[in-house]
Amino acid sequence: MIKVLKKKLIVGLEIGTTKTTISVGEILEDDTINIIGIGLSKSIGIDRGIINDLKSIVECIKKVINQAETMANCNITSIYLALSNKYINCQNEIGIIPILQEEITKNDIENVIHTAKSVRIRNEHKILHIIPQEYSIDERTGIKNPIGLSGIRMQAIVHLITCHSSIKKNIIKAVESCGIRVDYSVFSGLASSESVLTTDERNLGVCIVDIGGGTTDIAIYTNGTLKHSCVIPYAGNTVTNDISYVFNIPFMYAEKIKIKYGYAMQSSDITEEEIKIVNEDNTIIQTFHKDKLTEVIESRYIELLTLINEEIKNTQKKLKKSGRIHKLGAGIVLTGGASNIKLFKNCAEKVFNIPVRIGCPKKNNINTAKLTNNTQTGSLSTVIGLLYFGKKYFYSHRNKNSYNFFKKWLQYINNWIKKEF
């Protein structure tokens, strides 16, 4: 008799301004993730993470689900959902508790984190993530894992990421309208960090910048933990809008020429080649030179990168003022679809004045053989990161359930012994 093993599937869904993407991963016996399905569709009905046409975005979600189910030969029932919009905020908070036992236990950790998160957050906001940064015991600071240590008082610094509840609720409603359950909502910047950053980069200090169509996600790590996160409501579509306006052409044509001919900065490689915009009837509707196109693109990208640089500098000042590690030894990692434009790394280094690399999903512990070259460009960084995130959640949830079962079983035995003896 052949034993059929149930597949351990994880599904990630990103509903972006320009595209809706879904990925299906299978957790294999060797603990790697094998991507077995993918779905891609142009997004309609959402702008910068906020739904403006529920019916249209539901159709987009259904389309990518059908694509992924066909490719993976599976039935999708639940997903991990990426969130990115200008109403995502972060704050670092402190919790303090007395240490009552000889040694610090897991319960103490839970209590001090609970104290730190029990703060006033913005109206209509709900907490998405609670991320411990470091602990202090009496005068000892910078402790990463205090379990088993002794002391009188423990302090925790945690990073809280929040989202406007109605915006999150509407996106979940769109997913549930497709008959799909949302297992967990994840800030897109965290998901991209999971797929793109290395442990060494987080320890040295790094800032990941995920530039999509409508929003730019920023996450800053020092000493191995997340110190700051935010969303800037400007991204690749802002550049496309400029091209559309300057050359008086439809947005659709502007996006195509940005992808085909675009450079993020001037270069000797750029000639005075004439670009012709042709409509569906093969009629020329506009002509202009490539160097003029580059001029438009470069000015907007420099403006966006300057905004990002100001956010990074302000965060570093706050970290330095509080006596915490603030240097970004590993520099800046750029990812997302809008980072694919030629010479973007060079343009970014001119603004940031520190090392920059273009990040794409890591190849370790994940098999992307079924995917196209999109994985090499960073366009799928978030949706693949959701698979990494989902695997962690899968195991932690399973271990928690096992622990609760064992706890209930012990309680049952204790009650039985008391009753019988």
From Swiss-Prot:
InterPro entries: ATPase_NBD (IPR043129), Cell_div_FtsA (IPR020823), FtsA/MreB (IPR050696), SHS2_FtsA (IPR003494). One of its GO terms (biological process) is FtsZ-dependent cytokinesis. One of its GO terms (cellular component) is cytoplasmic side of plasma membrane. NCBIfam families: ftsA, PRK09472.1. This is Cell division protein FtsA. Keywords: Cell cycle, Cell division, Cell membrane, Membrane. Self-interacts. Interacts with FtsZ. It is found in: Cell membrane. It comes from Buchnera aphidicola subsp. Baizongia pistaciae (strain Bp). Transmembrane segments: none annotated. The gene is ftsA. Belongs to the FtsA/MreB family. Cell division protein that is involved in the assembly of the Z ring. May serve as a membrane anchor for the Z ring. It comes from the Bacteria. CDD domains: ASKHA_NBD_FtsA. Pfam families: FtsA (PF14450), SHS2_FTSA (PF02491). It is a peripheral membrane protein.
